[in-house]
Amino acid sequence: MDKIITAIFKVESEGYQALTELKQNPETDKYVVSQAVLIKKENNGLNTLDSFDTGIETSNDTLAGGLIGGLVGILGGPIGMLLGGSLGALTGSVFDLGDALDNESIIEKVSDMIMDGEVCMIALAQEKEPGQLQQKLSKFNVSIVESNAAEVEEEIEQAIKAEKELEKEARAKLREAQKEDLKNKVEEKKQQLQAGIEEVKAKVNKD
């Protein structure tokens, strides 16, 4: 079974070390790592630090194709930032992410766990026995989330739909705000014109 292993490191150098060790020895008698990427959360965005692709086939190579890239894209996009609390202005949105993502989803877990300045390694792997990669990474100060790769693919599809809904709502709110702003400006101009007319009338009556 293909798995997505997400490891969040408190110390950046440990993240680099973990990725390097897997890159140097991606296939053992305990596990096989096909792809991995190291990202860092900075200024509420995600930057890719390093990555590798061994070319080793997974049990579902079609599924594996853009899986890690898709997950990174979601985590660094509006949904990931909203779940991680980076889009404070939208947290009161009427759009309920709970309708789109399960509370136990990897997207929600990782978005909530990774803090600004921390690094995260995401790996696509197969294990001969459960917990083999966790055991290897346990020497680091790390928090690990494991998910079935097929389930992650489904989560990504749901998150993409949620992003589209969020974008539609944001556009609608922006248009409404622009209409309200225009209405206020028109009303302000009317008041200014009326004040000017009253001023002229007052001068005429005085003369």
Annotate each predicted stretch with a short phrase.
Residues 42, 115-117, 139:
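Short flexible coil/turn linkers enriched for glycine and charged/polar residues
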